[in-house]
Amino acid sequence: MTRVASTSAMNLAKKLAEAGIRHPAVLHAVATTPRELFLDGALAHKAYENTALPIGQGQTISQPYIVARMTELLLQHNPQKVLEIGTGSGYQAAVLASLIPELFTIERIKALQIQARQRLKRLDLHNVAFKYGDGWQGWSNRGPFDGIMVTAAAATVPQALLEQLSEHGVLIIPVGEDTQQLLKITRIGQTFQSEIIEAVKFVPLINGDLA
């Protein structure tokens, strides 16, 4: 299907540009991704507010600014193959899938994964592979990945995700518990260069348990 920018989505993209998002492709993706599709009907009227919102199961759809910021950080490295940890509502996956050739996404809550798959199908996004599983372990038999994006905060950086980065691959991950920082970690051979981007607040990345 052809994705047409609604006035509300265009206004949101404009606000994100004013907040510092510069990549035109990211702004276009936000403007043409119907965020209301990823929310319960009772919250649809809040879809284009720049705020995180509940999606059930104790999870949230991320603030549009942070979706755009994390996507922009990835696109700086022109990734062709990306792993997303934490499919959630599917909104971040929809933005990513419109910008990169191959997306792999993992969700530990089955009900959310089913809904996200249906939503991306409605948007005619067919370059996405879904997995129900423990995101802490990544998806080793589909790696390595040029980029990995984690949409929940890990207490520490999962070693498995570092190992699944390709050479010069980039991991975008929020790390911390009470205080969280968004990190950009770049693989150079067997070493990893870490850069603090900004303070953030995410739900925790759960290690092991599936729901």
Curated annotation (Swiss-Prot):
One Gene Ontology biological process: protein modification process
A GO molecular-function annotation: protein-L-isoaspartate (D-aspartate) O-methyltransferase activity
Family statement: Belongs to the methyltransferase superfamily. L-isoaspartyl/D-aspartyl protein methyltransferase family.
Keyword Transferase among UniProt keywords: yes
Major place of residence: cytoplasm
Catalytic activity line of the entry: [protein]-L-isoaspartate + S-adenosyl-L-methionine = [protein]-L-isoaspartate alpha-methyl ester + S-adenosyl-L-homocysteine
Enzyme Commission designation: 2.1.1.77
Described function: Catalyzes the methyl esterification of L-isoaspartyl residues in peptides and proteins that result from spontaneous decomposition of normal L-aspartyl and L-asparaginyl residues. It plays a role in the repair and/or degradation of damaged proteins.
Active site: 62
Keyword S-adenosyl-L-methionine found: yes
Lineage top rank: taxon: Bacteria
GO cellular component, one term: cytoplasm
Species: Shewanella frigidimarina (strain NCIMB 400)
Protein name (database record): Protein-L-isoaspartate O-methyltransferase
One Pfam family, short name: PCMT
Keywords: Cytoplasm, Methyltransferase, S-adenosyl-L-methionine, Transferase
Cellular location(s): Cytoplasm
